[in-house]
């Protein structure tokens, strides 16, 4: 029984450490946001899940916005914007 409680405690500890909180607009290799205006309804949800996010949608700027992604995922920022007007 003690081992079971220890196992459960470790599981929750690992879950808290690995918890993903990042959100934002997905960015491609060209530095531009993932466009979604002409894509199917579930396109952004699928792209966000590929990046290990929990959910996403086609946002106001007609780009994919994702929730709860790992910190390694690149997201768009006006300060680091490298998109050349595409």
UniProtKB/Swiss-Prot annotation:
One family name in Pfam for this protein: Toxin_3
**What is the tissue localization of expression for this protein?**
Expressed by the venom gland.
Mention any additional remark.
Answer: Negative results: does not modify the function of the Shaker B potassium channels. Does not reduce the peak of sodium currents in Nav1.7/SCN9A, insect BgNav1 and arachnid VdNav1. It does not promote a shift in slow inactivation processes as a function of the prepulse voltage in human Nav1.5/SCN5A and Nav1.7/SCN9A, insect BgNav1 and arachnid VdNav1.
Disulfide cysteine pairs (residue numbers) = 32-83, 36-58, 44-64, 48-66
Entry keyword set:
Amidation, Disulfide bond, Ion channel impairing toxin, Neurotoxin, Secreted, Signal, Toxin, Voltage-gated sodium channel impairing toxin
Q: Which cellular component terms (GO) are annotated to the entry? A: extracellular region
Q: Which PROSITE patterns match?
A: LCN_CSAB
Q: Where is the signal peptide?
A: 1-20
| Protein name (record) | Beta-mammal/insect toxin To1
